Amino acid sequence: MAASTLGSAWGPLRLGVPGLCRRRPPRGLWARARRLSEPVASGRSVAAGSGLGASGTDRYCLELLRKRDYEGYLCSLLLPAESRSSAFALRAFNVELAQIKDSVSEKTIGLMRMQFWKKTVDDIYSDNPPHQPVAIELWKAVRRHNLTKRWLMKIIDEREKNLDDKAYRNIQELENYAENTQSSLLYLTLEILGIKDLHADHAASHIGKAQGIVTCLRATPYHGSRRRVFLPMDICMLHGVSQEDFLRKSQDRNVRDVVYDVASQAHLHLKHARSFHRSIPVKAFPAFLQTVALEDYLKKIQQVDFDLFHPSLQRKNTLLPLSLYIQSWRKRY
């Protein structure tokens, strides 16, 4: 499908909020972020010593998220107060796993770190967590909400398999990776919120897949700088595009068509997720606020005609906190 047909294929993107600009913008999210983002000690000093307090481990997770997963940090701020610290712990756990691949020079070292987290999860469920800030906070979350161990292990197992620097063979392989990582994260978030609902699970599955696809697109310039390309090979072959085309940042139409096809799949998952909104408990909506950031990226990539390397796609959206707050206030996702 040609990229120029995006508008008719996707329909309108629901990012604007008519009428709200005349009201005083809600400021609670920024105020909450300022309160929670004060400087904290480094990971080494937080984890060391026997006097590590609850606030120390909690603040370590906050700072890790603020630096490494800012969108997840903002979304977590809008969860109910009683669920917030557990969500921070869960996302910090995900960050710890996600950054292993890019922080090691050898796969063997990465496997050792994954093994550490597998043992950590086992120890958490044996009420014997290691003296590591994220592990301690995750242990508290597991005890507080009786989180399902299987989802945590799925995230580790899938991240471990992804240590191989191989492109996804097809879009289904990328979706499977996203299901086992991002969707699993959302299933656990629903458990933190006390939600047991089949429709909410279906929505979480689609949102997680959309998140995984968008993350793959967003990370392509970074991976390209390290001479890696992970976009689905079947779609690249369909349009006659090689990995070298992405490495040299080609502006050719067939390269943009690859990006269009991949982005369209993310858009389709968002559409499916929203089709459940009338059947899902309103209490579950805060778990799905990341759709705001996903749709923002998809709108931007449409505006630049699917030029994956356009500078505007690398800029942080300064209005994202406001957009998230408004969607939360409207009880939408």
Curated annotation (Swiss-Prot):
Q: What residues span the transit peptide? A: 1-44
- Indicate whether Membrane appears among the record's keywords: yes
Pfam families assigned to the protein according to its UniProt record, in alphabetical order: SQS_PSY
Listed InterPro entries: Isoprenoid_synthase_dom_sf (IPR008949), Squ/phyt_synthse (IPR002060)
**GO term, biological process aspect, one:** mitochondrial respiratory chain complex I assembly
Keyword field: Membrane, Mitochondrion, Mitochondrion inner membrane, Transit peptide
- Gene Ontology cellular component terms for the protein in this record: mitochondrial inner membrane; mitochondrion
Q: Where in the cell is it found?
A: Mitochondrion inner membrane
Query: Does the keyword Membrane belong to this entry?
Result: yes
User: Any idea what job this protein has?
Assistant: Involved in the assembly of mitochondrial NADH:ubiquinone oxidoreductase complex (complex I) at early stages. May play a role in the biogenesis of complex I subunit MT-ND1.
The family classification in the record reads: Belongs to the NDUFAF6 family.
Which protein, by its recorded name, is this? NADH dehydrogenase (ubiquinone) complex I, assembly factor 6
